[in-house]
Amino acid sequence: MGDIVQNTNFIAGTKVSSIGVNSTTCDRDSTNTTAASSQSVKYLGLTTAYTSASGTKSIIIGGTFANNTDSEVELTVHLYDNSASATPAIVSRIPVPNGSSFVLRDTGKTVMEEFDGIRVYCDTANAIDVQLGILKGVN
């Protein structure tokens, strides 16, 4: 649960909320009007790239997300807000060409409270190298 659903019939950022024996439930409705059996749906697992330490705050300065594969990949980055149990998207479904990178800057100096985190989703396993600029220990 918590994986992102990647399909043209789901809004970017749609997540799996529960998994049953014969079904998967998402946190948003599909825009598709045909049966799910006739479509391909991909689930992207998350990687937590950073978690703010207990009792402190951190500020995201920026980051570089490098594609280390021979193919284009798609990248989504979320900020996990532990106090609200919410994960707003910082960027969603960004294409990163092979041998290239996506640079995150001017994030408005986003403040992360304790246990908040940066979560990275990619449509190809182990395809993105992440380097984050974070100011730690802010009170």
State where each predicted segment sits.
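Intrinsically disordered, low-complexity Pro/Gly/Ser/Thr-rich segments with frequent PxxP/GP/PP motifs
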Residues: 83-117
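Small/polar beta-strand repeat architecture
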Residues: 3-44
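Acidic glycine-/aspartate-rich tracts in secreted/extracellular proteins
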Residues: 20-23, 29-33, 68-71, 82-85, ...
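Short, Lys/Arg- and Gly-enriched loop/turn segments at beta-strand edges
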Residues: 12-17, 111-115, 127-132
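Surface-exposed loop/turn positions
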Residues: 3, 14, 39, 56, ...
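C-terminal interaction-tip segments
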Residues: 4, 8-11, 44-58, 62-68, ...
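Predominantly extracellular/luminal cell-surface or secreted proteins
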Residues: 27, 78-82, 135
